[in-house]
Amino acid sequence: MKLPALLILGVAASTMVLAAIAPDQVPLNDAKKDELPEKFLIELAPGDTRWVTEDEKWELKREGLKFFDITAEVEQGFLPKVFPTPAVVNFPSELNRTAEVKQLASQLSKENMFNHLTNFTSFHTRYYKSTAGTQSATWLFEQVQQTVNNSLAVKYGAKVETFNHSWSQFSIIASIPGRTNKTVVVGAHQDSINMYLPTIQAPGADDDGSGTVTILEALRVLLQSDAVAQGNATNTIEFHWYSAEEAGLLGSQAVFSKYKNENRDIKSMLQQDMTGYSQGTLDAGEQESVGVITDYVHSGLTEFIMKVITGYCDIPFVLTKCGYACSDHASASRYGYPSAFVIESKFEHSSQRIHTMWDTVEYLDFDHMLQHAKMTLGLVYELAFAEL
């Protein structure tokens, strides 16, 4: 792999960049300089594909472009119809669990999210091919496992499993059985990247450490419900933490490809990616809000999420767009499952520090993250007991 010119950093001197490279993640030596770099097939829009190296992936990131890495699909001879019409799901027309949700929501803790995120961002990077990326996944798995073990759910079939990939960082899936196999999914991605060079420090506090700890806290409080913990919800619930989102939604594509092959009955998928930055909205002179994505999502699920935000959050929503393949919900859509995405703000007001070493905890608003946790908790609880 060729190293991109350090001049691309612009704002950082080369000595600062080299100092930020972890000792166990040194650049490749000269003995490999003549090897041809591995290439990957990416899709930047429906039908718009190209072969690129991994360095070229990060160049696209620097340009603000998003994509699926569909190499595995080609190798397996399976290319799903892009954004097929999802199965018909009748989402509720109104909120039906207000008393239960509001009682549970009072137990959500900003302190828990802060403590988890402080630890999670202490890893040099969570780059999906790095040693630190595997270590961070192991740490996160332990937190999710402890969350489930500390609840009644562990006695009623709840489990936490790794979903292994061909690269070292695994995805994580927590499952809480319901009375049917119809499944409600909430996701976030656990990896991080420095778009200038993968070995450079990438704390990934907002992208997507914030979503990672937001849904972890929602899971903790959800399991305080005896009805959920004891398996009495109508539908099964899953919480996902995906690997390798930054490299082209690799982890989530692997998960939903497997689910499709197994004929899993996934009724909804909500992605929480970047939940912590509110200052961009305030600096623009606008009211604090959460951003409901309206492109490449399921309209019925998205409309119900708007009701959830209105009913359970203390701030309003705004409608915004993020483009093709912009986060892991797109993988669910790709395989025919209804999906939605709620981000921290209008897309243009979201954090500009992502994919750099400056995406750190100090710039995040944990009161804002609490609103995302309320929305996540409310949505999951409502859909867990709905006839979908």
Swiss-Prot record:
One Gene Ontology term, aspect cellular component: extracellular region
UniProt enzyme class: hydrolase
Key words, A-Z: Aminopeptidase, Disulfide bond, Glycoprotein, Hydrolase, Metal-binding, Protease, Secreted, Signal, Zinc, Zymogen
Example of a GO biological process term: proteolysis
Any one GO molecular-function label of the UniProt entry: aminopeptidase activity
Cofactor detail note: Binds 2 Zn(2+) ions per subunit.
Main location: secreted
Chain residues in the propeptide: 20-88
Localization terms from the record: Secreted
Name of this chain's protein: Leucine aminopeptidase 1
Chain's gene name: LAP1
